């Protein structure tokens, strides 16, 4: 048997004692969750979005690094000028990876039922119908994963 035990959280943010050792367990911040998934800092931190919505968005999202590698490798098999549309886009993880490979304007549409996630998509990728330009240019540089 192991001489260590699993840490059990008694109450949120409350120290607990285990064999005379004090531990403090805390929740990750939305920024830390974005970084953990490989998103740019502040990706879900847009005006009108609560921390709760940000946690939900990151929890329902995907980790970007492996998808960036897959999309990069797919590119050599696709025709020049390839575009994508996204069903159930969430906060745009696939779309972000796509435009980093294929360029701005190549993720041409998305569909999302969650209103907070839809706001994130419009904020970054824009929405012609609503006159929102988006700021995706800030995120086209590839991070080093």
State what each model feature region is.
Residues 73, 78-145:
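Core alpha/beta nucleotide-donor-binding catalytic domains of modification enzymes
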Residues 1-83, 100-101, 113-116:
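Class I SAM-dependent DNA methyltransferase catalytic core
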